[in-house]
């Protein structure tokens, strides 16, 4: 059974649920289903551990972070296998990208925590102001199911490195690697209570956690509706909300079309299309639209859909039957709205092995001649479905890109540097990638605008949620003080 990790030990619950392999439909095992009682224990443990952990020298915290990163690196094959088993993500992506990146998160933030440098502001020879970065306290880290381990470590590493303690709540759909994170943290020597892992449903464990009065900050990755609800009900806390996306890809006639094609395919179909930064709306200038669309559809048809455990697989299975139904429901909507289906669709991929007969597989699906007002272009699908939309000129491209409730990532393809800068300035998104797919640098701020969330994480931007800034004002002893009542 997969249990909770509370105060440095495994803890059971009276309630359990069954975890399933989405590629086969087979049960993996039982998972402890936490609620208010387990959350109370975890928050209490984190609160008790906080003063000592916050007072631990940064160099010692950094040493423990690096040790945890080393243990993750040593366990990459095992962790990748669990992640693929749990989520349906292709093994070549979990093993070669996601789990190694999780290890790097701890290495990177181990360095960041030793550089919590404030600023000083002298006022002539009268006063000196300086700032301190100090830990917040108990933080709730709520991680999604699509890339669970990488996202969990992306939150845990800066949180702990900066002197906070944490309660990590994983999605009930992807509990396996979170359990391993709890185990490896103990093995690394992280003091008990500093990192606690709660399993369970969002409506019970998650709700109890974000509402808890002793939780001082919330870092959440998930759907926009859930993020809004948390901010409406959890009270006065620090928030980092990385929510949904409908990211535009703008491809101009002067772009390197071959590289743009490679990047556009990768950006939508990697991670099974279940990624917040997916380039799900691809806008192509009219003069190159027919050529690009034909080549894109042909390439999409050649992608390998199949067993996530097969290193050759490029697109695995959807996470659950419910999510499969949601994605295929949008494919039906696209057909009803009059978009042109060029690849994929509702038919199951051909030549799936017998043991995958109950898996939730969807072919990479390409819709052309889409109007940006269609539901498939406006609503987050979170699967391997893409909209190809023509545009006339730069002004229309910008208008279409911004015509959405979301604003997470955006991608611009052009050789005109002036055009690239104008669009980067005008586009309503937290991140802009020019002539590139989503290439992450841990120093960069990650986050969105509008319906894609609030706050930023990454490098020193993680201080926004995981640190409090305190100002200290010192008089040199000679500044004027009004004398009242003399």
Give the residues covered by each predicted segment:
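Hydrophobic face of amphipathic alpha-helices that form TPR/SEL1-like repeat modules
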Residues: 1-24
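Rossmann-like NAD(P) dinucleotide-binding subdomain of oxidoreductase/dehydrogenase enzymes
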Residues: 118-259, 391
